[in-house]
Amino acid sequence: MSIYNKQTTRVQVEVDGYTWRVHGRRHGLRWHVHLVEQIGLLPLDYPITPRFRDKLRTALAKALEMDESEVARISADLILA
């Protein structure tokens, strides 16, 4: 049985009043993010910080009904805002 999912999943989450579409898939035992894009017309009015990325990861884990440890950390260069 393979635990690698080749299908990319898109999940929409809301963090700090902004809506984000997260593209990623499960690879091995963890869910990995490939791209995060901001949805909506409002420009982001603060920088992408490690704290913000942790909030995004927590919201993503909740949306996927997974433990936060099962979602890999999100790199800042994967976020389009």
Where are these regions (language model features)?
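Intrinsically disordered, low-complexity regulatory segments enriched in Ser/Thr/Pro
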Residues: 22-47
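Residue-identity detector for glutamine
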Residues: 7, 12, 38, 65-66
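Mixed-charge, Lys/Arg-enriched low-complexity segments
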Residues: 39-81
